[in-house]
Amino acid sequence: MNIKRPFILISNDDGYHANGIKTLVSFLKDHADVLVCAPEAARSGFSCAFSAATPLRLKRRHNMGDVEVWSCNGTPVDCVKLALSELCGHRKPDLVLGGINHGDNSTVNNHYSGTMGVAREGCMKYIPSVAFSTCNYDDEADLSYLRDDVCRIVERVLADGLPKGVCLNVNFPAQPPFMGVKVCRMTFGSWINEVVKARHPHGYDYYWMAGECRNDEPDAEDTDQWALNHGYIAITPTRIDITDYAFIDTIKSWSL
């Protein structure tokens, strides 16, 4: 590795083989020392889960050009933990990136997302961290049109850093041209019609998690979902500390 170049750790929740992570590596490999450690298979929806009772394995995969690639049988967070402990050596990454995720992580999906789990884990290790996602759900889509925007965000975070305990959730509309960038808050919403019930031929019920994410404030123009719906790149600063400070005094008044 060239210590004069930034060192970037990349993971995701779609798996080391996914088009999105390969695209992200291709954007950055000529400008930084990049290391990939990602799940061996898709781990969408794993958020910040880690493996407390399952032994983990690291497996070396084929390089992406000159970029070293490892997979792990665990979660996205497991990948970050193992990479920092076992693969990075004595060099701490300058940046942790998650993505590029096939599917947006706006609104409450922020909480479920394994891609955001990558960024949160990096953030909790005091490393500037960013999660990238696109509303384009096509696993084989050509995402090269994201290059300039991704690189500009990465360069700015490398130059200026991020506040302690803050990571970025970046979501792109499905297709260009983009209207610009909106720095915005997370949309409040909820998943509805989530459970699909079916009957197995062997005589028992089984269930699929499905449904749709409902936007509960569709007219609020300061939200990530509004930005995406109107063609803007949505950047949401996300805090690790989820304390509701405004409500602390109210709870104290309960005399519990």
Where are each of the predicted segments found?
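Short, glycine-rich nucleotide/cofactor-binding loops
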Residues: 10-17, 109-110
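A cross-family phosphate/adenosyl-ligand binding-site feature
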Residues: 2-8, 19-86, 90-91
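Hydrophobic/aromatic ligand-binding patch that stacks against planar heteroaromatic rings
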Residues: 118-122
